[in-house]
Structures are given as structure tokens and as C-alpha cells.
Swiss-Prot record:
It comes from Halothermothrix orenii (strain H 168 / OCM 544 / DSM 9562). IGPS catalyzes the conversion of PRFAR and glutamine to IGP, AICAR and glutamate. The HisF subunit catalyzes the cyclization activity that produces IGP and AICAR from PRFAR using the ammonia provided by the HisH subunit. GO terms for molecular function: imidazoleglycerol-phosphate synthase activity; lyase activity. Its main location: cytoplasm. Pathway: Amino-acid biosynthesis; L-histidine biosynthesis; L-histidine from 5-phospho-alpha-D-ribose 1-diphosphate: step 5/9. The active site is at residues 11, 130. This is Imidazole glycerol phosphate synthase subunit HisF. It is found in: Cytoplasm. Heterodimer of HisH and HisF. GO terms for biological process: L-histidine biosynthetic process. GO terms for cellular component: cytoplasm.
């Protein structure tokens, strides 16, 4: 088993980190750059920043936040939200981000995945897939979970891999923010359908849930927000738990 990555997720709105349940009822969790520094010290393997209103409100990411974060942390970080063009990607990567995450724009213009991979390399391109269960399958949503696409999540995952995505960030909207555990059935279905790494997102409430995502869901990395922001568990506590259950993690 390859080393598994633990990734705190920072949902950003109006320059602040927020968290809600099922993509609603957002509450303030702090300054993104300060939180990034904190998680770097805590032993996080990577960070993901998602500007959760950028796509819906048709506005680009604040480059200033990217530059400040790049100057403050030593771990890789991904930026998503409002990225619609190759020039958007270039601006964010040039400002210091290691990867860009695209979601709504990838569905509307799948060629953006292929072009981004060609220009910057697949390792820089993460495709985020937000989905809900429907009639025994999973349906893809865009625009921050507000717009249903009719796409099947597993088929879409295979398509983004074919187009050149380097990773998939897979969020169960049903589980998001509930702290009841990841949708391991969804994770396993997508992980077995593609060769590229799948990052589990949505539902972490305790270290056991991250273990389930890795073992049952076959995830390559696990992303969590509430349990870390609220200091229910620290990154190091989660890593110690996973290591104690035979899962390889980076311990400093």
C-alpha cells in the first residue's frame, strides 16, 4: 500500500474559511493563510483551497491569497473555484499553487482538462466531482452543488482520466459536513473504475472514517475539514490512529 495523504480542506468565501452541512449554513472558521500555516506545522501532507462561491458568482480566485500561502507553507497546495480558462490556471500556478482543481468548467468544457494537462502536465490538474445518490447511481452536480448535470459520476470519472486529469477529488454531497463517514461505496466504485488517484471528500467525523475511506473506499488520499477546523482531532492524531491500524502515512 502506498503512503496515504491527509489533506485539510479550506472552503473559502469572501476571503475567509467557512464550513457548512450539505453545502449550506456556512459558518466562519478563520483566515485561510493562518490556517494553512497551522496545518503545515501540524503535519498535513497537502492542502486544498476551494473558493466555494467563485464558480457560481462568476468571479476569479484571489491571487493575493495564493501568493501569501505559497510564501508561508512548504507543502503542496491545490486551488479550486472559478477556474475557467488556461490563463486562469497559469495565473494561479504562477502565483505559487502546485495544482488547480476544476469542476463546473470541466463539465461545461471537457477540452479544458486536456488542454490544461498538455500545457502544465497532468500532475497539476485535479478534477473535482461533486455527486449525489440517485436511483442506485451517483449523479454529478456543478456550480457549488446547485446545478444537476445528468452525468453519471463513474462514467464522468473515467472520462476525465481519459482526458488527462492527474487526480480526482470526489465529494459525496449526501455525506458532506454530516460527520457520519464518507460514502465508501461511491469511493470504491470510482477508485476501481480509474487508475489515477482518488481523493475522498465529504463526511469525516472521526479517524475511523478516514480509515474506512482508505480501506473500504480504496481512496489514495483523504480530505477533511470540520474535524480539523474545530480541533476535534489534529492531523497528527489522525495519522497516529491510521499508522496504528497498519495504514502507511508520513509521520514527522
Amino acid at each position: 500500500m502506498l503512503t496515504k495523504r491527509i489533506i485539510p480542506c479550506l472552503d473559502v468565501k469572501g476571503g475567509r474559511v467557512v464550513k457548512g452541512v450539505n453545502f449550506k449554513d456556512l459558518r466562519d472558521e478563520g483566515d485561510p493563510v493562518e490556517l494553512a500555516r497551522y496545518y503545515d506545522r501540524e503535519g498535513a501532507d497537502e492542502l486544498v483551497f476551494l473558493d466555494i462561491t467563485a464558480s457560481a458568482e462568476n468571479r476569479g480566485i484571489v491571487i493575493d491569497m495564493v501568493e501569501k500561502t505559497a510564501a508561508s507553507v512548504f507543502i503542496p497546495f491545490t486551488i479550486g473555484g472559478g477556474i475557467r480558462t488556461i490563463s486562469d490556471m497559469k495565473a494561479i500556478l504562477n502565483a505559487g499553487a502546485d495544482k488547480v482543481s476544476i469542476n463546473s468548467a470541466a463539465v461545461k468544457n471537457p477540452g479544458l482538462i486536456a488542454e490544461g494537462a498538455r500545457v502544465f502536465g497532468s500532475q497539476c490538474i485535479v478534477v473535482a466531482i461533486d455527486c449525489c445518490r440517485k436511483n442506485g447511481n451517483w449523479e454529478v452536480y456543478i456550480n457549488g452543488g446547485r446545478t444537476v448535470t445528468g452525468l453519471d459520476a463513474i462514467k464522468w470519472a473515467q472520462k476525465v482520466e481519459e482526458l488527462g486529469a492527474g487526480e480526482i477529488l470526489l465529494t459525496s454531497m449526501d455525506a458532506d459536513g454530516t460527520k457520519d463517514g464518507y460514502d465508501t461505496e461511491l469511493l470504491a466504485a470510482v477508485s476501481t473504475a480509474v487508475e489515477i488517484p482518488v481523493i475522498a471528500s465529504g463526511g469525516a467525523g472521526m479517524p475511523e472514517h478516514l480509515r474506512e475511506a482508505i480501506v473500504e473506499g480504496q481512496a489514495d488520499a483523504v480530505l477533511a475539514a470540520s474535524i480539523f477546523h474545530e480541533k476535534t482531532y489534529s492531523v497528527s492524531e489522525v495519522k497516529e490512529y491510521l499508522a496504528g491500524h497498519g495504514i502507511p502515512v508520513r509521520i514527522e
